[in-house]
């Protein structure tokens, strides 16, 4: 099963015959195509596994080597040999299955190149890569010195105290606080610009197991003598937006479409300010005390307590917020309180476990110019909750270092039901939708922050949805292409796809901001910057990302070695691989 032609070591540099037969192909190309076909007779059946020849390229794009001795070195020795740990690993289909080689090291980009015959694409399942793979720390790796026994005992006692404090405050905390400012990594697989086969743009959690790439085979590919499959594999930094915090919006005019279900007065309002000086927290007794501190030291907080019987109105979702039963509550703030709150104020609900509906959410929060504060609370149910309803609305000035939505994310954006934050938010249809023709579905939510939203569609028969880039301060518009003559029907809560927010540093290419295609491609190029005269960057989805801003991917041996144990979370005798496989057929 080996492919032992030394002339095919670097397939990217040789001309490839594009079409077989006699249609405009020269004699040299015909002989070359026949030679390739004879060499590939032993490879007509999958699986195909990349496990051999490597080309390690430094970030500056100067050094390139095919020295097999690099494969026998430790990761540290490999990094020293290449001159930089930020490298590109290039894998080809040239391998020996009797003596598979393991590519150990840390890389920012893995390129897979494979030349196939058209009939090989008919095989439904092909393994492209199978290797133990681990991502680096998203927020930076930290090394600590070994602690003494006394330090370990002290640390253990502190851990117990912290654990008790966390258990006491567990009811007050929410998922937003526990995941605050945490970046995660996700694997991205996309075709290279010289690839004939264009699999669908795919994002995968970096967990062991088999991940499927789907690809549609064009009829033109069947007339080629050799078909090139070229993929780029890299890891993006992603971050999860807060789902239980709603920003305070300020407006000048009142809207009287919905009357206030209840009006609160000053006794139900509590204004306090948290003063943080030299890690000592104090509560200012009044607004006057709070005004003496600077904005950098002052964190004003307004708490609105509600324990009343309220009226409920039915809404179907949309701009007004989530669907279900909603109640509109108002409270008039004094001019001093409204001024002291300042900008960048977020609100969230604190529920009473005994008297609050568990599905109660904050759907909108608005402060008008005359000091009137109005907010809507919604619960997704058909029957009104029992009276009275008890909860607290807490408004707090804070700096959110994550993307946040203009209004409540529900019912459009839902956390993944599996609970894994690296799987992105689920984008669902809030109501039953029937389409006869192609349609643009607009979701009336904006997000803010220096991030890039990416919508990856879910596979659905009879429909085609392109990968869509979502820019800050804009609506999310999804294009649905209906291929079935009878149209398509989306039931309520149908899954459209997943939404990710990329936190890797990037620059936008204004010429191609939206990836309104089904088959996305990527390009590796060099760009001069103020920090580097020749910086290697990867362009994908209308954005360019420097390789150094991608998460490093560490390839380990199948058997865990002593120096690898400290880098793995669950130390086992054998590390499970991350496997990529391609399925040809309908997207």
From Swiss-Prot:
Subcellular location(s) of the protein: Host nucleus; Host cytoplasm
Chain location of the short sequence motif Nuclear export signal 2 (NES 2) per the record: 360-367
One Pfam family cited in the UniProt record for this chain: Cytomega_UL84
Ranges of Polar residues composition bias in the record: 140-149
Intervals of motif Nuclear export signal 1 (NES 1): 229-238
Compositionally skewed regions (Basic and acidic residues) per UniProt: 155-169
Basic residues: compositionally biased ranges: 10-19, 32-41
Keywords: Host cytoplasm, Host nucleus
Principal location class: host cell
Chain segments carrying region Disordered: 1-48, 136-185
Listed GO CC annotations: host cell cytoplasm; host cell nucleus
InterPro entries linked to this entry: Herpes_UL84 (IPR010436)
Motif position, Nuclear localization signal: 161-170
Purpose of the protein: Plays an essential role in viral DNA replication. May participate in the DNA replication initiation by interacting with the origin of lytic replication, oriLyt and subsequently recruiting other viral/cellular factors. Additionally, interacts with and shuttles IRS1 viral mRNA from the host nucleus to the cytoplasm.
Family: Belongs to the HHV-5 UL84 protein family.
Subunit structure and binding partners: Interacts with the DNA polymerase accessory subunit UL44. Interacts with HCMV major transcription-activating enzyme IE2. Interacts with host HNRNPK.
Annotated protein name in UniProt: UL84 protein
Organism: Human cytomegalovirus (strain Towne)
Lineage: Viruses, Duplodnaviria, Heunggongvirae, Peploviricota, Herviviricetes
């Amino acid at each position: 099963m080996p492919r032992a032609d030394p002339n095919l070591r670097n397939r990217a540099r040789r001309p490839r015959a594009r079409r077989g037969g006699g249609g405009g192909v020269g004699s040299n190309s015909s002989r070359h195509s026949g030679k390739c076909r004879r060499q590939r007779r032993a490879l007509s059946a999958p699986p195909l596994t990349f496990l051999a020849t490597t080309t390690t390229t430094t970030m500056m794009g100067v050094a390139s080597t095919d020295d097999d001795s690099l494969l026998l070195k430790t990761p540290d020795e490999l990094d020293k040999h290449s001159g930089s740990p930020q490298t590109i690993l290039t894998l080809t289909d040239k391998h020996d299955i009797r003596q598979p080689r393991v590519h150990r090291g840390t890389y920012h980009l893995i390129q897979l190149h494979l030349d196939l015959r058209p009939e090989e694409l008919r095989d439904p399942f092909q393994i492209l890569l199978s290797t133990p793979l681990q991502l680096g720390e998203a927020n930076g790796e930290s090394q600590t010195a070994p602690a003494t026994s006394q330090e370990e005992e002290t640390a253990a006692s502190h851990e117990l105290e912290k654990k008790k404090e966390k258990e006491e405050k567990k009811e007050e905390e929410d998922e937003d606080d526990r995941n605050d400012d945490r970046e995660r990594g996700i694997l991205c697989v996309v075709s290279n610009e010289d690839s004939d086969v264009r699999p669908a743009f795919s994002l995968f959690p970096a967990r062991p197991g088999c991940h499927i790439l789907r690809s549609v085979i064009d009829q033109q590919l069947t007339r080629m003598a050799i078909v090139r499959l070229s993929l780029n594999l890299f890891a993006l930094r992603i971050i999860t937006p807060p789902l239980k915090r709603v920003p305070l919006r300020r407006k000048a005019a009142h809207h009287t479409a919905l009357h206030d279900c209840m009006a609160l007065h000053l006794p139900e309002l509590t204004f306090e300010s948290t003063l943080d000086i030299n890690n000592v927290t104090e509560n200012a007794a009044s607004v006057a005390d709070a005004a003496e501190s600077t904005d950098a030291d002052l964190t004003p907080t307004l708490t609105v307590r509600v324990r009343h019987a309220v009226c409920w109105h039915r809404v179907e979702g949309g701009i007004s917020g989530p669907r279900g039963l909603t109640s509109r509550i108002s409270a008039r703030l004094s001019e001093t309180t409204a001024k002291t709150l300042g900008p960048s104020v977020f609100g969230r609900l604190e529920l009473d476990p005994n008297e609050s509906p568990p599905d109660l959410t904050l759907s909108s929060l608005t402060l008008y110019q005359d000091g009137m504060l109005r907010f809507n609370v919604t619960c997704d149910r058909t029957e009104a909750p029992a009276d009275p309803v008890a909860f607290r609305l807490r408004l707090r000035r804070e700096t959110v270092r994550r993307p946040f939505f203009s209004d409540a994310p529900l019912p459009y954006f839902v956390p993944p039901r599996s609970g894994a934050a690296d799987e992105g938010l689920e984008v669902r249809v809030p109501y039953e939708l029937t389409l006869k023709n192609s349609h643009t579905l607009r979701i009336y939510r904006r997000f803010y922050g220096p991030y890039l939203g990416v919508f990856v569609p879910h596979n659905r028969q009879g429909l085609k949805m392109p990968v869509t880039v979502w820019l800050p301060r804009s609506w999310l518009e999804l294009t649905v292409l209906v291929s079935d003559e009878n149209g398509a029907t989306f039931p309520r809560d149908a899954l459209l796809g997943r939404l990710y927010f990329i936190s890797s540093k990037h620059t936008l290419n204004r010429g191609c901001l939206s990836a309104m295609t089904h088959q996305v491609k990527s390009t590796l190029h060099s760009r001069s910057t103020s920090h580097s005269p020749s910086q290697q960057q990867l362009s994908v989805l209308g954005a360019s990302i420097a390789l150094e801003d991608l998460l490093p991917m560490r390839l380990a041996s199948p058997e865990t070695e002593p120096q690898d144990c400290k880098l793995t979370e669950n130390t086992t005798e054998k590390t499970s691989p991350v496997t990529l496989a391609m399925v040809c057929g309908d997207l």
